[in-house]
Amino acid sequence: MARKLYPIGLQTFERIRVEDKFYIDKTEYVYRMAHTDGTCFFLNRPRRFGKSLLLTTMKSYFEGKKELFKGLAIEKLEKDWISYPVLHFDMSMGKHMEIAQLERYFDQQLAEQEQKWGITNPAVDANVRLISLIQTAYRETGKQVVILIDEYDAPLLDVVHEDEKLEELRNAMRNFYSPLKGCEKLLRFVFLTGITKFSQLSIFSELNNITNISMDEPYAGICGITEDELVNGMRDDIEALAEKLNLSYEQTLAKLKDNYDGYHFTWPSPDVYNPFSLLTCFAKQKIDSYWFGSGTPSYLINMMRNFNFLPANLGESMEAGKDDFDAATETMTTIMPLLYQSGYITIKDYDEETELYTLAIPNKEIRVGLYRSLLPHYLTSKTAMCNTTIAKMSVLIKQGKIDEALQLLKSFWETVPYCNNTHYEGHYQQTMYIIFALLTNFRIIVEQHTSKGRIDITMETDDTIYVMELKFGKTAQEALEQIESKHYADAFAMSGKEIIKVGMSFNIKDDNTIVFDWKSSEI
């Protein structure tokens, strides 16, 4: 029997079911939310994580389309199948807009619904038009109205760092959403999704009863593909990929886990895989980076610069209280809320005694994608050549040929033009960290603390630990001598692995060419 086609790029539940495409059953979550306390709910998850599909699933459910749910969990749970009027607004295309464009976008969204409900002479103001829509739908059907808003925050994502523009767009959105409070008696269910969490007062100033389910344990697996769903529902897909890759089932599952797993949106939580990447991997029969290819995180790069957040910090686990990362992005004082809510870091552990969460990059796909996105900001040119150099270095390091690998790096640096704003040690340290972090087969730690001081870069392979010190304006010999005088290598004496000390240096010649050098020493 032929496998079902994957719904890559499709986010309409009705179409997926009618065309009999592959579907991970999330309808139990839909039923649970529809039959719990409260009317208005909010969920934030990273992009391409299934939020739009979830909303269209809810749309079909609240419209009473029982035939679409045959064989799914909700078929046995729901007894009444009442049809409600549904107003579905998609804000996902409202990006990169000035205020006038956003107001026209609101107009288009409202006009589509007004045509459906036969409203021919709408008012001018968006909030008045939404009130009219709710009242008309209620009057025409005699039933409370369901409102579904997809990617509510899309118009704001690119202007989080622009206070004046942010406030202007936020005011327009506040006006648009304001009827949700006044029309509360006419509403059966309201559900909003987005990537980031903006403060309730900034957009929903009148709506004080939103239930945020984003970190609620019962909804931990509402979006994405859990490990249980993968192993129990997609075994044939894993086996087909294993055959293509000439690997065992267990080896293939391990590779999928390393590349696409690792997300947790509360604790405890099931392991959650990135659904877009996982399904694309199965469709293409190739393990690759797919999530970054579907969108460039320009707003994230801008915010990292604004907060002076260094690439090296991404490689470290971070400890934080819930309010430090599950916070409103427009008032954040660190980059952590944006990194977490956008899916670049995720929850890895929780300490009940301190109430602190441990957060880190979820998987290899995110780590590689992030560092590749950051590389051009440290190397304004030669990025493609750098990626080629990194790939060749990885092979040599795996073979234990560290000197040959660093010779490649030396040759690369000779091609990089010098810029005045790079005349400091930190720039080269961060650039080198990105380069080494992209050596994805190895464990990289930057500024590792020991009892003797801080090691600039530590690289660990299957059988070797490289202890590296970087100097600017000094010699590689001086860098190597610091490793020895500070006894940095002592921290790894019990590792059972070979230890190699590497001193590295950068110098700028009179003709403004960059000179990279190194000296290595085995213990």
Positions of predicted regions on the chain:
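Mg2+/Mn2+-dependent nuclease catalytic core
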Residues: 167-171, 472-489
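Metal-dependent nuclease catalytic cores in nucleic-acid-processing enzymes
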Residues: 176-183, 337-345, 431-437, 482-502
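Structural motif
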Residues: 146, 464-466, 500
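Phosphate-binding site recognition
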Residues: 1-424, 439-440
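Domain-level recognition of nuclease-like catalytic cores that cleave nucleotide substrates
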Residues: 491, 495-523
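Active-site metal-binding core of divalent-cation-utilizing nuclease and nuclease-like domains
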Residues: 136-141, 435-462, 509
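Conserved catalytic cores of phosphodiester-cleaving nucleases, focusing on short active-site segments
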Residues: 432, 455-472, 486
